[in-house]
């Protein structure tokens, strides 16, 4: 038995200079797990609650001392003495103790930090790397794959202080044969993009996720800059590198008039018009994945978008599904989208996250493991991607150590599995829905 003997919570600082929750779980034998909760900027309304103190005298109201107190008191008292290797039981104890539908009593940031720290401690007690322990929890021991990165190299929307409406313009190095090669391709495109932007007299400051955040005349201009960078790096767009976008459409959807208002380029669209606007971009550029291409509540719009684009483009639900099996099951039943973005702080525990990944895969949906715009050096999502053989990961650009920490962990994992004589496959383009 991997007996829990101590649980510690503390307030630390994330990549945006805001507080977040870090937890330690200590086991008999001296094994310790340490994990921190990430935080989003563009958040779905149905996400589990991130508990903030609201005290304007501390961190502009964004302190997390209430959540930390829950870790150090109620949660600690409930799980000390329990077996850390029983992840589902530990998570359920915390969920039941919280007693709310959206984890608003303790905060999903408190419960998740403990959930992940517990998994890390249990892995250490078994002498396993975290990804191997996660594979066992997932019911797929020894089944791994290296994820195809989805690299956000131009930031807009809520992730940047610029005039670009679409939140993320990403590249996927689909022509790579290994994860490490994919990262090299991504880095080379990233550096060439800096040269392209500088030559145009554009800003090369970076946004929350490490991508560039220039002011551009249109969203199509962002794609054109990336195309030029890919070619300058010596790669073929559509063959070696494909494109992906996160529209984060809820951020520019006007609920009063039902229009998608893209103020950066002075255009407004109805739901169907916006789908055809995206369809036009897909015809001009090899865009193979679109995330949140409609408002989170516009299920009719998503159904239409899936009908128009779903057979040729991966349509990822983020704010739409919020890593929640109840909402995902409704989407599956109604043929809405064909992929889910997995952010474990949207749901608030590792067990519930694994359930969402399983439900998606069982239904033929892809699962893209994702960071948040507010991150720490915690690299758990790298192990989650490998341990569930999810196939794709979205963890920012090739700058900012809070992003690169995840890529470096993936390099270590790929290397370790190869050294053990059990290399994990890197399937590249085949991982993207509709691209096999």
Swiss-Prot record:
Q: What class of enzyme is it?
A: lyase
Keywords annotated in UniProt: Cytoplasm, Glycolysis, Lyase, Magnesium, Metal-binding, Secreted
CDD domains this protein is in?
Answer: enolase (cd03313)
Give its E.C. classification number.
4.2.1.11
UniProt remark on cofactor binding? Binds a second Mg(2+) ion via substrate during catalysis.
Q: Does the keyword Nucleotidyltransferase apply?
A: no
Instruction: Name the residues that bind Mg(2+).
Output: 246, 291, 318
Listed under GO biological process in this entry are: glycolytic process
Q: Where, by residue number, does (2R)-2-phosphoglycerate bind?
A: 167, 343, 372-373, 394
Pathway connected to this protein = Carbohydrate degradation; glycolysis; pyruvate from D-glyceraldehyde 3-phosphate: step 4/5
The UniProt record lists the keyword Cytoplasm: yes
What the protein does? Catalyzes the reversible conversion of 2-phosphoglycerate (2-PG) into phosphoenolpyruvate (PEP). It is essential for the degradation of carbohydrates via glycolysis.
Q: Which family does it belong to?
A: Belongs to the enolase family.
Mind telling me what this protein is named?
Enolase
Origin species: Glaesserella parasuis serovar 5 (strain SH0165)
């Amino acid at each position: 038995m991997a007996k829990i003997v101590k649980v510690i919570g503390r307030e630390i600082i994330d990549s945006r200079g805001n507080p977040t929750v870090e937890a330690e779980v200590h086991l008999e034998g001296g094994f310790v797990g340490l994990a921190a909760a990430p935080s989003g900027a563009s958040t779905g309304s149905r996400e589990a609650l991130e508990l903030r103190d609201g005290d304007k005298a501390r961190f502009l109201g964004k302190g997390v001392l209430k959540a930390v107190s829950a870790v150090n008191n109620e949660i600690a008292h409930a799980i000390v003495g329990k077996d850390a290797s029983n992840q589902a039981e530990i998570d359920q104890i915390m969920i039941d103790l919280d007693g709310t539908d959206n984890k608003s009593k303790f905060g999903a940031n408190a419960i998740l930090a403990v959930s992940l720290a517990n998994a890390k401690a249990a892995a250490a007690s078994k002498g396993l790397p975290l990804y191997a322990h996660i594979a066992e929890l997932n019911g797929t021991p020894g089944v791994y794959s290296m994820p195809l990165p989805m690299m956000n190299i131009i930031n807009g929307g809520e992730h940047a202080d610029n005039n670009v409406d679409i939140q993320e313009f990403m590249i996927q190095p689909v022509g790579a044969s290994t994860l490490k090669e994919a990262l090299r391709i991504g880095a080379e495109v990233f550096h060439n993009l800096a040269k392209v932007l500088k030559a145009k007299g554009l800003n090369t400051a970076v946004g929350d996720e490490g991508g560039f955040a220039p002011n551009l005349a249109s969203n199509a201009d962002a794609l054109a800059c990336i195309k030029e960078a890919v070619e300058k790096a010596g790669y073929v767009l559509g063959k070696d590198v494909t494109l992906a976008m996160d529209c984060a459409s809820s951020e520019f959807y006007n609920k009063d008039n039902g229009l998608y208002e893209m103020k950066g380029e002075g255009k407004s669209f109805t739901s169907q018009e916006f789908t055809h606007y995206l369809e036009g971009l897909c015809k001009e550029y090899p865009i193979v994945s679109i995330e949140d291409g409609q408002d989170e509540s516009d299920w009719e719009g998503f159904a239409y978008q899936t009908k128009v684009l779903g057979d040729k483009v991966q349509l990822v639900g983020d704010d739409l599904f919020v890593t929640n099996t109840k909402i995902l099951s409704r989407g599956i039943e109604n043929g809405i989208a064909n992929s889910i973005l997995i952010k474990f702080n949207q749901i608030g525990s590792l067990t519930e996250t694994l359930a969402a990944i399983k439900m998606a895969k069982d239904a033929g949906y892809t699962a893209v493991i994702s960071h948040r715009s507010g991150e720490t050096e915690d690299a758990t999502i790298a192990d989650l991607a490998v341990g569930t053989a999810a196939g794709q990961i979205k963890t920012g650009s090739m700058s900012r150590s809070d992003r690169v920490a995840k890529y470096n962990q993936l390099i270590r994992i790929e290397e370790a599995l190869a050294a053990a004589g059990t290399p994990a496959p890197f399937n590249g383009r085949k991982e993207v829905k509709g691209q096999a």
